From Swiss-Prot:
Mitochondrial intermembrane domain ranges by topology: 70-99
S-S bonds: none
Similarity comment text for this entry: Belongs to the Tom22 family.
Main location: mitochondrion
Domain of life where this protein originates: Eukaryota
Gene from which this protein is expressed: TOM9-2
Tissue distribution of the protein: Expressed in young cotyledons, roots, flowers and leaves.
Protein name, per record: Mitochondrial import receptor subunit TOM9-2
Taxonomy of the source species: Eukaryota, Viridiplantae, Streptophyta, Embryophyta, Tracheophyta
Length: 99
C-alpha cells in the first residue's frame, strides 16, 4: 500500500515562484542592507580599537616599563645599603638620596 502524502496535490505544492517573490521582497532587501551596514560598522570599530590598543601598548612600553625598572633598581640599592649597614654594626638610618 502506498503512503499518502499530505499536501502533495496540485493545490498543496504551493507556488514554485514563492522563493523568488520572498527573496525579492522589500523586507528582505532592507534586512540585507542592514546586515551589510552592521558588518561595515563592525569592521570600522575593530580597526579603531586595534589602533587604540597599539597606541596604549606602545605608550606603556615607552613610559611605564622603564619607570618600573628604575623603581626596582632603587629598591634593590636601598636593600643592599641596609644590609651593609647592619653588617658594619651601625644602626640602620634612612639615607636621603638626591638632596
Amino acid at each position: 500500500m502506498a503512503a499518502k502524502r499530505i499536501g502533495a496535490g496540485k493545490s498543496g505544492g504551493g507556488d514554485p515562484n514563492i522563493l523568488a517573490r520572498i527573496s525579492n521582497s522589500e523586507i528582505v532587501s532592507q534586512g540585507r542592507r542592514a546586515a551589510g551596514d552592521a558588518v561595515e560598522v563592525s569592521k570600522k570599530l575593530l580597526r579603531s580599537t586595534g589602533k587604540a590598543a597599539w597606541i596604549a601598548g606602545t605608550t606603556f612600553l615607552i613610559l611605564v616599563v622603564p619607570l618600573i625598572i628604575e623603581m626596582d633598581r632603587e629598591a634593590q640599592i636601598n636593600e643592599i645599603e641596609l644590609q651593609q649597614a647592619s653588617l658594619l654594626g651601625a644602626p640602620p638610618s634612612p639615607m636621603q638620596r638626591g638632596l
